[in-house]
Amino acid sequence: MASPEGTDDEGGGCTGWFHVEAVVKKRTGDIISEDETEEDEGTASDLDGFLDNSNVITTQADRETAQQLLHAQNTYADTQTLHNLKRKYLGSPLGDISNQQFVCREGVKRRIIDTDVADSGYGNTLEVEATQQVQDNTYGSGKQQDGGSQTSVCSRENSIEADSDMDIGATPPQQIQELLKSSNVQAKLCYKFKELFGIPFSELVRTFKSDSTCCHDWICAMFGVNETLAEALKTIIKSQCMYYHIQCLTCTWGVVILMLIRYTCGKNRKTIIKSLSSIVNVPSEQMLVQPPKIRSPAVALYFYKTAMSNISDIYGETPEWIQRQTQIQHSFQDCQFELSKMVQWAFDNDVTDDSDIAFYYAQLADVDSNAQAFLKSNMQAKYVKDCGIMCRHYKRAQQQQMNMKQWITHICSKVDEGGDWRPIVQFLRYQGVDFISFLSYFKLFLRGTPKHNCLVLYGPPNTGKSCFAMSLIQFFQGSVISYVNSHSHFWLQPLDNAKLGMLDDATDACWRYIDEYMRNLLDGNPVSLDRKHKQLVQIKCPPVIITTNINPLHDAKLQYLHSRIHVVPFLNPFPIDTNGNPVYQLNNVNWKCFFERTWSRLDLNNDEDKENHGDSMPTFRCVPGENSRLF
């Protein structure tokens, strides 16, 4: 049977304690005595601890601990962020004490720049403005702070300028150590040089990229030199140079030396650095070595003015490039270029090739004012071409004006003394040639006598035919023609400007060509010669030497040449010693002695020259003379 609703059944079942809890003995409006109140309070105190609230207290304590931990972590993160910003933009206070905090690595900066991803264009604006503001404030206060990490927006100039403050509170050895640790030592040295001497090092020198290029004049800057060694340098270096200009300044790095030096001979940068390092005990990283700008008036004026001050030590005579640009008399000597002087120089020195003229005449700029004006001109190529053409014209006219005797005298005057005629005679005898008969024919050969104008050297290979003929052609400054060019109309053109010609190694086809087209040429009679880009010219063929392995006298098909040639057999192998050198020396010195020895036998004395007691030919002069008389 179901239980009835309500609580009428008091004390029944398990609900009795609810009844006790719910019974209200007092009603609204009843008077409560003080005794009951105290009893009630005592009753309430008896109920303390009836309910377990420890779980609620533990949960609240855990929540408060987590909030405190989060607050501590946020505070620490904010502190670190603020500290990083201060180090980034304001610098570290350690910079005022030590400079070790300011080591700006260029490689690190480059990596930062390379890895920096560009944003929309406004991401780095705050950083740049903050950096500029900090720098302005720093410079405005007249004090720079070192240390701290450098941002990627710092330029190379700012880093160099900040590095210069390393001088404050540091000893010279520490300065040198910091210098060697720098990422760009050369830039740091150049900045220090400008700070001390007031002029950039690059304005005084011209750059040589190669360390092996030689030069006489050099500018050397040495940093961190000991004072005793700096004074000793002035004495030790005198034995190696003709001139030096030394300036010594003292700074926190030690002694800094600026030296302009002219060595007795040309030296390269490697040699100079090695020599100076051994004297002043300074590594190559602490040196700047370059040649000076010898054509700069500003550089010449700088050394000229500093030479008059008391900070410079001078030894030797001042270089001409300084005198020329600073002294009045040298300035007056500057002149305009004259082609005639250049042609006269080329003629006197037998320089007829255009490349040789340009190269050797440019080297005279230090001693010749006309050569200096030539280098300053913008028409050097035209001047070189015109000079070569005129020099060749003069040489050709001089050669054609001389006879054989005068020409031999002329070429002998250009050969050194000390030769011996015996090796030539011994070589002819070694080949079985009768020397007396050879001289008789050689006399007619040099005169260009008809039917005696061609000398043929015949023999097997390696008998010295070409060596003998080439040495004679070289002494005579003759011309060589080659049958390989026979298909050209101009292959005989070299004979037009020669006193002696040569055709080396004539083959059977060459002899057929000579027999068909060149009979008059071998006779020594006048022939018509075709020249390239020029009109035909009529000349008398000079004496010709032909070397061959074929004896033309044994060939019946060449019978018309037999009376026009003289064959000299060379049948024995050319002698060579154990060192590979020829036993018989055939050179210009020996040929000169040979002609001087056989001068009378070759009948080179002419009656028309007896009245001339001086040179066979007057001295050529193409430079206009100057009248020194005053009217």
Curated annotation (Swiss-Prot):
Residues annotated as domain SF3 helicase: 433-583
UniProt-annotated location(s): Host nucleus
Listed Acidic residues bias regions: 32-43
GO cellular component: host cell nucleus
Keyword tags: ATP-binding, DNA replication, DNA-binding, Early protein, Helicase, Host nucleus, Hydrolase, Isomerase, Isopeptide bond, Nucleotide-binding, Phosphoprotein, Ubl conjugation
Transmembrane segments: none
Recorded catalytic activity of this chain's protein: Couples ATP hydrolysis with the unwinding of duplex DNA by translocating in the 3'-5' direction; ATP + H2O = ADP + phosphate + H(+)
Binding site residues for ATP: G459, P460, P461, N462, T463, G464, K465, S466
Source taxon at top rank: Viruses
Xref: SUPFAM superfamilies: Origin of replication-binding domain, RBD-like, P-loop containing nucleoside triphosphate hydrolases
Phosphoserine PTM positions: S92
Record motif Nuclear localization signal, residues: 86-88
EC annotation from Swiss-Prot or TrEMBL: 5.6.2.4
GO-annotated molecular function: ATP binding; ATP hydrolysis activity; DNA binding; DNA helicase activity
Gene3D superfamilies named in the record: 3.40.1310.10, P-loop containing nucleotide triphosphate hydrolases, Zinc finger, large T-antigen D1 domain
GO biological process: DNA replication
Entry function: ATP-dependent DNA 3'-5' helicase required for initiation of viral DNA replication. It forms a complex with the viral E2 protein. The E1-E2 complex binds to the replication origin which contains binding sites for both proteins. During the initial step, a dimer of E1 interacts with a dimer of protein E2 leading to a complex that binds the viral origin of replication with high specificity. Then, a second dimer of E1 displaces the E2 dimer in an ATP-dependent manner to form the E1 tetramer.
Subunit structure: Can form hexamers. Interacts with E2 protein; this interaction increases E1 DNA binding specificity. Interacts with host DNA polymerase subunit POLA2. Interacts with host single stranded DNA-binding protein RPA1. Interacts with host TOP1; this interaction stimulates the enzymatic activity of TOP1.
Protein family: Belongs to the papillomaviridae E1 protein family.
Protein name in the entry: Replication protein E1
Organism expressing this protein natively: Human papillomavirus 30
